[in-house]
């Protein structure tokens, strides 16, 4: 580990030297690359230097334990205790920092929410989840764009697909994939009985052209007339688009825009992201036979979280975490859940690394 850290520090010093050159601003693209690489290394190098300083101080204070002066020995003993307590924590932080980063963490995210079991109540819950993620996005200064929506009769969603763009969106939302269960008394329930319903959430990194190769001959594109509620035609032009990726039989439809070209562009964006997510899923399955037991497996059949409204309780079943702050969570305050899931994923990765 320390040989790797020394290599990173050497690279950091080389970047500092490159950034100090007088002609560094001549090539703006290269300058941006250098500053980003320098910033990416700064935290781990700073922590490594702190670890080195504490190690050196600890060695010096251990020598002072044999000093003739009892006061110096007492002070040294106190410093040794402090150093011995701090060093393992620093080593753990360094191990976490050296874990391979997910290259997709930086990407924007396509979020798909679908009503599951529970009829209209499930559709209303799907709308509540969309609102929750929208509020979370507002708190993070992210931008939300609805790509496609299929409303239900009472203001819910049978399905809604959106693009969330901003800083490291996928790294925060990737553990939200799975089945979300709700327990509450529906507005339509006259007897006051608690009903259980569910919605599924799919989280996919936004695919770019370099991520996925889609050949035109692998696509079947159908154009048809968009229809609204009750079968009413939204407009008289054929602007709705259905794209089928023949090799994977992946189908995406989009009819929200009046422009056929805009609908096609949106459908292609969703299609590419689904194909990328499916390929990543296949690779992950091959790499880890027990991945379903891991945090963030993304298996949609897996019940990952329960929202119990009568008790004001939210339980994430993957990490056995229960929070009694459901009202705040539904208003988008998801950071406690996101951080806990991220910490659990890091612990799992460290365990896997240790067993290799």
Curated annotation (Swiss-Prot):
Entries under SMART domains matching the protein: PCRF
Protein name: Peptide chain release factor 1
UniProt GO MF annotations: translation release factor activity, codon specific
Gene Ontology cellular component list: cytoplasm
Entry annotated with the keyword Cytoplasm: yes
Record localization: Cytoplasm
Chain residue ranges for the region called Disordered: 281-301
Family that this chain belongs to: Belongs to the prokaryotic/mitochondrial release factor family.
PTM sites of type N5-methylglutamine: 232
UniProt PTM comment: Methylated by PrmC. Methylation increases the termination efficiency of RF1.
InterPro entries referenced in this protein's UniProt entry, alphabetically: PCRF, Pep_chain_release_fac_I, Pep_chain_release_fac_I_sf, Prokaryotic/Mito_RF, RF-1
Family annotation (PROSITE patterns): RF_PROK_I
UniProt main location, coarse: cytoplasm
Keywords (A to Z) from UniProt: Cytoplasm, Methylation, Protein biosynthesis
Role: Peptide chain release factor 1 directs the termination of translation in response to the peptide chain termination codons UAG and UAA.
Range of residues in the leader sequence: none
Domain of life: Bacteria
Disulfide bonds, paired cysteine numbers: none
